[in-house]
Every structure is written in structure tokens, then in C-alpha cells.
């Protein structure tokens, strides 16, 4: 043997193969992309290969501003792309009156549905491909980068949400004021025109808001989310919901402020949350007739409220009743309303624990041991027989009471106070989440801690302060959101409604918030909602369910103009996704994962702040 060769390391063919495979795959990808680009240039550019043509083939009505809400004009359609256009392989911009396009909450199509139980305010999505638009939702004229957090809690640019109507209608209640080129949010509301602090102080005198035992809150009829904004001072996370109605921009204002919110209504279907999700539910003059339909809406609140959770109500008949009492006057109508309300609460076995102007507070029981005898005597409502109280995607509300855990299991379902709650999940211990274990939960938590550290180290996305509103399109156990908890962000954790096991209950047990969703449809939110979109395995999940083009166009609709996207998936899937994002004018780059950190897959990063 040559002495010069005897100290050379022995090469392992297997290691060489593993080392060079990622480079070979990426080289092949770029070669194919180049060939594809050349092919596109030689074809009819009206039709991007292997993709549905971005086209608009029929008229559609959508209001542009609040001034023309009553009679929206026909949508202005773009002319067909010219064959000589060098950009015709790109998706076209939608017309300008698409700036606030809500595919599943469109006022013109809603008119064909019944007003009974506000059904027309429910989700009504385009159900066939011909009714979906293949265009990019434009930003409003004069759009500016939103104020950074926490400044955004108080200010929003008028051009970003160009609706004066709410400021005019609610100017005496201090919801929002228009001052020059910006909106100012002074913290008022219908029940607290003098400011939300004094209002919350009344609740604080009864409930332990600062103890960590109350972490997740549902605010029904949220206005501009001033209540939820103030509760952040106590590290309480509030899901603020309201329908798209005459105050059409209230949820949009909340999101522009950097607060968790989505379009939602108590109507026909269950709210898209699991049972036992919220520590407190709040209604301040939320315009819900709680005693209608034999108390059906309160039964739905009971479903999503945790054992020993609180229901806080202000406004008629509560506030008015106290006011009349102070003035030594009485109102028969209001008294009757309150008696009906108390009757529903007796049937639900709730306990009134405080009545202090302007609120009344009830508490849900920890179990139904004492309640079962009463329910049997009353005969209505009974306990629900449904085997899955967490099923809530397009499921009609049920006139029954969701059973609570057996008294012997009560200790197993008790939540820790925040922030210990983040890593303590009772549903895992009770075995209600099939296919998951405590060990698996811990491994998932650690994996996402490493992944988020990798994101921040390599891409500088998280620590630069640019991102406030975040959505995780396939949240799993909420590991991504949990890893972000140290950053000034909030995360909407989405769990696909048909995914097994159903993990959204785990997300809420951790003190996080989220919703069920079908990504073949549009999300119940306004355009330009999120600064950062995270999609882990989403496209693999939906490849055989619907066209991924529509999912990507929905992501474009809800992403802010200078926002970012992180897509993690199989390499072959991301090649298809990347071809589409190129046509969306997104600046995307693919990265192989570091196998020493991650198990498999590829990352596609889109950063639209880079021009």
C-alpha cells in the first residue's frame, strides 16, 4: 500500500448518498423550473401549465365602502389578459372593490338566505369552482404598514380600514374616533363609554382576573375589542367575535389593532370551538336574545364554557334593571326578561354569584351530580346524548346540556393556572385524545421549541418585532404557538375539522386559542389579517381534497402586504406550491431542513417585506 494513502479515511457510500441527495434534488428542481419557464414562454400565456387559469367569468356584488352598502354595484371585472402581456402567467389583481372581500360572508349572496335565527349571518361559502375567484385581493389605496405593537392597540391608519360609519355611530360611546389620517381607540364601549378600566374593575372586584385561573375568554359582540385589549394586562387571551352587520368593520378594527378576533354569530350552527374551551364568556349589550328558542344560545355558551367557568353579562335586562332599581322605578317587561333568564340558568344549574352595576355574573357547576335529579324532574332540557361534544364544524346547536365529567374524574380535568397551564394538559391524562401520550406531547413541545429557534436564528422573523398577528394553519397540539409565547405575538391555532385525533381541545387546555377550519373554504376573517402564516403539512393534507391553488389564494387574501409565510412540507409538494406562489408574485425560497435538527421535509419561506 502506498504510505501516502494509508491514513486516508474510508469513504462510506451510504453517507455520500445521504450527503449529496439534497443537493441533487434541488439541482433537479431548478433544472425542471428552468425548462418549465421556457415552456411557458412558448405556450399561450393565458393558460399557465398544469394550473387552472386565473379567471373571472361572472358578475359578483360586493360593497366597496360603507356609503354604498345598501345597494352594492356589480363588480368591475378585469379585461381578459392580452396574449402579448409578459405578466399574463401571473394571477391578475382583483378589482378595487375586492379590497374587503369576504368569500363566506358576502352581503349580496347572504340575502338569499332566511333571516330566521340570523341564518343569513352564518358562513355561506362558494360551493362550486365556478363561484370562486382566481385573482389576488388588492390592498386599499393609500395602505400603510400597520402601527407596531403595542402602539397598534391605540391607533390604526384610516386608509387601512376606510370606514367612517362606526366612528360616527359610536362617537358618544368612545368606541373609536377619527383624528386626521388615523383612528384612535380611547377604550370605550356601549356599556363603558367612560372607559373600559372602570368596567373591568367591577368584574375584578368579584373574579380573580390576575390569579392566572382565568386565561381564555370569549367576548360575544365584541365591538372593537376594547374589552379583550384591556384583559391583556392580566395575561388573559380573548377570542373576540361579532357578525358582519351594519357595524361591518368592528372585527376588522380589532384585527388591525393586533387583537385576536374573527367573524362569528350565535345563530344556527355551533361555534367552531371544542367543549370546555373558555374560562369566561362575556356579553356586553351583544344584542343576543338569550331566552329565545328555550335558551338554546345559553346552552351553546354552556358547551364551550369550562366547569366552574364564569358568564359575565351587562346590558338589558341587567343594567337597566339595576338602574331602574336605583331610581325606585320598576319595569315589568325588564323584570319578565330577567325572570326568564334566571329560569334558563336554573335549568343549566348555574349559580348567580354577583350582581353589581353594570354586570351580573353566573358560574357554571364543576359537575352535574346534584343537577341530574333537577334535570330529570324538569324534563327539559336533558343532557346531550351526542358522543362527541367537540364536533362543532357546521353542526347545528342542540337543545340540551353538554354533560360534565363524572365527579370521580373532576380532579383529572382541573387546569393549572397560567402560565403552568401551557405544559399541563388534562385531556391527555384522561385519555380523551386517542393516539397521543404524555411522552408524545413532551416530544412535540421540544421539537417545536427547536424549530422556532431555527426559524429565528436563520430567518430573523420573530425577534424583529414586525409580526403581531400569526396563524398556524395546522396547529396539531399547539407546539408552534407555545414556542412563540415569549414573543409579543398571538397565534390563531387552526385544526382541520376532520383531522384525527381532534387536538383543538388540547390547544385550549394549554391556554391558547384557535378554531376549527376546512381549508377548502375561506376563513371567517377580513383580508390583510395576519402578519405571519405558518403552514405545516397543510398541502399534503389537502392534495386529494381540493385545489391547492385556492388554498394559496386564500392565504394571499388574509396575509398583510408585507407579511411572511413559512410552509413546511414534503419536497415534491413544495415544488408544486412554489410554482404557484411564483405566479402570485411572492418572493419564495426553498430550504432543506437540517437533519440534525428536524426529522424530514423542506421549508418554503416567503418574505414579502423584501422587494
From Swiss-Prot:
Lumenal side: 37-611
Enzyme Commission number(s): 2.1.1.-
Top-level taxon of origin: Eukaryota
A Pfam cross-reference name: Methyltransf_29
Location in the cell: Endoplasmic reticulum membrane
Membrane disposition: Single-pass type II membrane protein
Sugar-modified residues: 68, 97, 289, 408, 411, 587
One BP annotation, GO: methylation
Principal location: endoplasmic reticulum
Name of this protein: Probable methyltransferase PMT19
Record organism: Arabidopsis thaliana (Mouse-ear cress)
Lineage: Eukaryota, Viridiplantae, Streptophyta, Embryophyta, Tracheophyta
Amino acid at each position: 500500500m502506498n504510505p501516502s494513502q494509508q491514513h486516508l479515511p474510508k469513504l462510506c457510500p451510504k453517507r455520500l448518498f445521504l450527503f449529496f441527495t439534497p443537493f441533487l434534488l434541488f439541482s433537479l428542481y431548478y433544472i425542471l423550473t428552468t425548462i418549465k419557464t421556457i415552456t411557458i414562454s412558448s405556450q399561450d400565456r393565458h393558460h399557465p401549465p398544469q394550473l387552472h387559469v386565473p379567471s373571472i367569468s361572472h358578475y359578483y356584488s360586493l360593497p366597496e365602502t360603507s356609503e354604498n352598502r345598501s345597494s352594492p354595484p356589480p363588480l368591475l371585472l378585469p379585461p381578459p389578459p392580452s396574449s402579448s402581456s409578459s405578466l399574463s402567467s401571473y394571477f391578475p389583481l382583483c378589482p378595487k372593490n375586492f379590497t374587503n372581500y369576504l368569500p363566506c360572508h358576502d352581503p349580496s349572496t347572504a340575502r338569499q338566505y332566511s333571516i330566521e335565527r340570523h341564518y343569513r349571518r352564518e358562513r355561506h361559502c362558494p360551493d362550486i369552482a365556478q363561484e370562486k375567484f382566481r385573482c389576488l385581493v388588492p390592498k386599499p389605496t393609500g395602505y400603510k404598514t400597520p402601527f407596531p405593537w403595542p402602539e397598534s392597540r391605540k391607533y390604526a391608519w384610516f386608509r387601512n380600514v376606510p370606514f367612517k360609519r362606526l366612528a360616527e355611530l359610536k362617537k358618544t360611546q368612545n368606541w373609536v374616533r377619527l383624528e386626521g389620517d388615523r383612528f384612535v381607540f380611547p377604550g370605550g364601549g356601549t356599556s363603558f363609554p367612560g372607559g373600559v378600566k372602570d368596567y373591568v374593575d367591577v368584574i375584578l372586584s368579584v373574579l380573580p382576573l390576575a390569579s392566572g385561573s382565568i386565561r381564555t375568554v370569549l367576548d360575544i359582540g365584541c365591538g372593537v375589542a376594547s374589552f379583550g385589549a384591556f384583559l391583556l394586562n392580566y395575561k388573559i387571551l380573548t377570542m373576540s367575535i361579532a357578525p358582519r352587520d351594519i357595524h361591518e368593520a368592528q372585527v376588522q378594527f380589532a384585527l388591525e389593532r393586533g387583537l385576536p378576533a374573527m367573524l362569528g354569530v350565535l345563530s344556527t350552527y355551533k361555534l367552531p370551538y371544542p367543549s370546555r374551551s373558555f374560562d369566561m364568556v362575556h356579553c356586553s349589550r351583544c344584542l343576543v336574545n338569550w331566552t329565545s328558542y328555550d335558551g338554546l344560545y345559553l346552552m351553546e355558551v354552556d358547551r364551550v364554557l369550562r366547569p366552574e367557568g364564569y358568564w359575565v353579562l351587562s346590558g338589558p335586562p341587567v343594567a337597566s334593571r339595576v338602574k331602574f332599581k336605583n331610581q325606585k322605578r320598576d319595569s315589568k317587561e325588564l323584570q319578565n326578561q330577567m325572570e326568564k333568564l334566571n329560569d334558563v340558568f336554573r335549568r343549566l344549574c348555574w349559580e348567580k354569584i354577583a350582581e353589581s352595576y353594570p354586570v351580573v355574573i353566573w358560574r357554571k357547576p364543576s359537575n352535574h351530580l346534584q343537577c341530574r335529579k333537577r334535570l330529570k324532574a324538569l324534563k327539559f332540557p336533558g343532557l346531550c346524548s351526542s358522543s362527541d361534544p367537540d364536533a362543532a364544524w357546521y353542526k347545528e346547536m342542540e337543545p340540551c346540556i353538554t354533560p360534565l365529567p363524572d365527579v370521580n374524574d373532576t380532579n383529572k380535568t382541573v387546569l393549572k393556572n397560567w402560565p403552568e397551564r401551557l405544559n399541563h394538559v388534562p385531556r391527555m391524562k384522561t385519555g380523551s385524545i386517542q393516539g397521543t401520550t404524555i411522552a408524545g406531547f413532551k416530544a412535540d413541545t421540544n421539537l417545536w421549541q427547536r424549530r422556532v429557534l431555527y426559524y429565528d436564528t436563520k430567518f430573523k422573523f420573530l425577534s424583529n418585532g414586525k409580526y403581531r398577528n400569526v396563524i398556524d394553519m395546522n396547529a396539531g397540539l399547539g407546539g408552534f404557538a407555545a414556542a412563540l409565547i415569549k414573543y409579543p405575538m398571538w397565534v390563531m391555532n387552526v385544526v382541520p375539522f376532520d383531522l384525527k385525533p381532534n387536538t383543538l381541545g388540547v390547544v385550549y387546555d394549554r391556554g391558547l386559542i384557535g378554531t376549527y377550519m376546512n381549508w377548502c373554504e375561506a376563513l371567517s376573517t377580513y383580508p390583510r389579517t395576519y402578519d405571519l402564516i405558518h403552514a405545516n403539512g397543510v398541502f399534503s393534507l389537502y392534495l386529494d381534497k381540493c385545489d391547492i391553488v385556492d388554498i394559496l389564494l386564500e392565504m394571499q387574501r388574509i396575509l398583510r402586504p408585507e407579511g411572511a409565510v413559512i410552509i413546511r412540507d414534503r419536497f415534491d409538494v413544495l415544488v408544486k406550491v412554489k410554482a404557484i406562489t411564483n405566479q402570485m408574485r411572492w418572493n419564495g425560497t426553498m430550504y432543506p431542513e437540517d437533519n440534525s435538527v428536524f426529522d424530514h421535509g423542506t421549508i418554503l419561506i416567503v418574505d414579502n417585506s423584501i422587494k
